[in-house]
């Protein structure tokens, strides 16, 4: 199994001076297992995004209204222990670095007319806290019943009694999926990869 060599760190609001603590949600530690393509997203290109209204950090949103939806397992909070086995689960770690990377290039995506949203199965309370702490300029969507996953048959995994989304990013054009990034690794590089793909079109 391939692993990430060398710790990677993404900036976060209010993180100035923080070190690579064991539960530093802004850091990707060295040695993370690299997820493999299990074919769980092979069917997605060509599908239409459903007309599905969900709660988000910026109010109710319809997933059809977005051009890029990055879907992630579960963001952490500083000082809160990770779920047992989180770092050993391929693709689990890195939700905050991924989100912060999308935040940091949001202006460039907006200049291309691209509307972005992040989405996980976490509660609205979790998404509101996360969005405020990290100054997210776009909606962070709450899908605790995994309704988008049911509509599109999105890949999931089980950990600590929870069913969570596997990390993937959907790019849509007129609400039809034209590109899927899956698996996504390292997570903090995904935003730049998406931007490069969009600019090359």
Annotate each predicted stretch with a short phrase.
Residues 2-201:
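Chalcogenol-based redox active-site neighborhoods
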């Amino acid at each position: 199994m391939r692993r990430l060599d060398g710790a990677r760190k993404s900036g976060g609001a209010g993180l100035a001076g923080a070190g690579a603590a064991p539960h530093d949600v802004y850091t990707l530690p060295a040695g993370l297992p690299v997820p493999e393509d299990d074919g769980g997203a092979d069917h997605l290109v060509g599908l239409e995004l459903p007309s599905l209204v969900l709660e988000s950090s910026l109010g109710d949103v319809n997933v059809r209204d977005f051009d890029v939806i990055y879907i992630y397992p579960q963001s952490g909070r500083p000082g809160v222990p990770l779920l047992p086995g989180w770092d050993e689960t391929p693709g689990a770690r890195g939700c905050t670095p991924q989100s912060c990377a999308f935040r940091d290039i949001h202006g460039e995506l907006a200049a291309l007319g691209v509307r972005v949203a992040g989405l996980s199965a976490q509660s609205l309370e979790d998404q509101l806290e996360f969005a405020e702490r990290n100054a997210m300029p776009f909606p962070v969507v709450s899908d605790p019943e995994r309704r988008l996953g049911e509509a599109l048959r999105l890949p999931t995994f089980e950990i600590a009694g929870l069913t969570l989304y596997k990390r993937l990013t959907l790019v849509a054009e007129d609400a039809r999926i034209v590109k899927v990034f899956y698996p996504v690794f390292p997570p903090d590089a995904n935003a730049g990869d998406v931007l490069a793909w969009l600019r090359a079109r």
